[in-house]
UniProtKB/Swiss-Prot annotation:
Name of the protein this chain belongs to: Small ribosomal subunit protein uS17
Assigned protein family: Belongs to the universal ribosomal protein uS17 family.
GO molecular function terms attached to this record: rRNA binding; structural constituent of ribosome
NCBIfam families recorded: PRK05610.1, uS17_bact
Listed Pfam families: Ribosomal_S17
Amino acid sequence: MERKSRKVRTGRVVSDKMDKTVVVAVDTLVKHPLYGRTVRRTRKFMAHDEDNQCRIGDKVKIAETRPLSRHKRWRVAEVLERSQI
């Protein structure tokens, strides 16, 4: 039985106050079912940041992984862009 490919998302870090954990906001564009307008939906994921390298505003790529805690199922794969703060 082959293993399914893991999901990858891109988003912005909105919180880095926890040790080795960041909160990443991921935006997706969804078409409204009745009116047809494209609407932005935002979802927040807790992601594991082993080296505490991410800061608020960084653009990061997160990858799905095994459950690391009650809320963490994602890890930071790479930092795509540093924030200018």
